[in-house]
Amino acid sequence: MSVFTKGIYDRLYNDPILRSKINTYNSEPAIFTVEPVPGNARLPYVVVSGPISDVPFDTKTSLGREQTVDIRCYTENHGSKQEVEEIAERVRELFHRQSITITGYKNIITSCTGPVFIPEDEALGMVVTVRFINEKEGI
């Protein structure tokens, strides 16, 4: 797992409110950083994508990266969107305008768009898109 993915995972993993809203997998919170999600994983769970964009954010005196990551939230479709909305809103609260720890980098900006619904056949899904600007330390 990259230092960027680890920073995101750690923020999600260490939040007791989020943990209370999602299932477990192998005795750990059901937060996945690989796809596809294991077939025996039970909803609700959260999936952290790899970067959907990753571009330089360099200056004359610094090296940086601007990355965009999707964090998808899934629940069973019981006819109500409340559960998936609560999980997705919590994910947004954990990242929007919050600084996260990334080994070797200083997190300059974190902002979110969404959550928005994503079409799924068997489950309800919402995605929070998170934009990070990180500056490499020690340059």
Segments (PLM) and residue ranges:
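Small/polar-rich, solvent-exposed N-terminal microdomains that initiate assembly or binding
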Residues: 1-59, 98
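Acidic-leaning, charged glycine-interspersed low-complexity segments
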Residues: 20-21, 25, 92-139
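Short histidine-centered beta-strand/loop micro-motifs
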Residues: 57-62, 83-85
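Oligomerization/assembly interface segments of phage tail-like spikes and tubes
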Residues: 62-78, 124-135
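Mid-chain, well-packed structural core segment of small domains
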Residues: 73-93
